[in-house]
Regions:
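A generic structural signal for well-ordered coil/turn residues at beta-strand boundaries
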Residues: 13, 23, 77, 116-117, ...
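Proline-glycine-enriched beta-turn/loop adjacent to the NAD(P) cofactor-binding site
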Residues: 34-35, 146
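NAD(P)H dinucleotide-binding glycine-rich loop of Rossmann-like/cofactor-binding domains
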Residues: 89-167
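Glycine-rich beta-strand-centered segment in the early N-terminal region that forms part
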Residues: 20-34, 47-93, 132-135
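Active-site/binding-pocket entry motifs
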Residues: 11, 35-37, 71, 87-88, ...
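Nucleotide donor/acceptor-binding cores
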Residues: 1, 79, 161-162
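N-terminal glycine-rich cofactor-binding segment
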Residues: 3-21, 38-67, 82-83, 100-114
Length: 167
């Protein structure tokens, strides 16, 4: 499969890589679309201190499950999914209080582990969220960035009288 790989800062190549196989609890996603985020640019330029090289970037992606690992229902095959790139342990204190984004063992697809700028990606099944057929692909790829705005709005709880600056 072809993958966009940042070998080191400012060095991008398209590389042929082996087709990944899903492990226990994982699914393999045939990627249809991926969004480009500022953080992908930061990794390319070497401005993300958490990125490890070489790295397949891309944390905003959408596709279809084409293989499942042990322990994952075969009914997931063929599902259209958006991928939550934040992989958390589910057991540490932040996870136990509903804040998996600050997990003590946090792994982010496209930063710490290869992401979605590839033809296929293996991700935990719990991070692959079913997308109804009524949602077009071009909108489904935007689920991850939309969740950022939705989360901030949920925490800020703005009212009609509030003024917000979006940067």
């Amino acid at each position: 499969m072809k993958s966009v790989v940042i070998q080191q800062p400012n060095a991008l190549v398209i590389e042929e890589r082996p087709l990944p196989l899903p492990g226990a609890g994982d699914v393999r996603v045939k990627i249809k679309l991926a969004g480009i985020c500022g953080s992908d640019s930061h990794i390319y330029r070497g401005h993300n201190p958490f990125a490890k090289y070489p790295r397949v970037i891309g944390h905003e992606f959408f596709g279809e499950i084409d293989a499942v690992g042990e322990g994952v229902e075969s009914t997931r095959l063929g599902q259209r999914v958006s991928v939550d790139p934040v992989i958390s342990c589910g057991h540490c204190y932040p996870c136990s209080v509903g804040k998996p984004n600050v997990c003590t063992s946090l792994v982010v697809l496209g930063v710490h582990r290869d992401g979605g700028f590839s033809e296929y990606a293996v991700v935990p099944a719990k991070n692959a969220w079913h997308i109804p057929d009524a949602i077009p692909d071009k909108h489904a790829v935007m689920v991850e960035p939309f969740t950022i705005a939705a989360n901030v709005t949920g925490q800020a709880k703005p009212t009609e009288q509030d003024v917000a600056l979006i940067y």
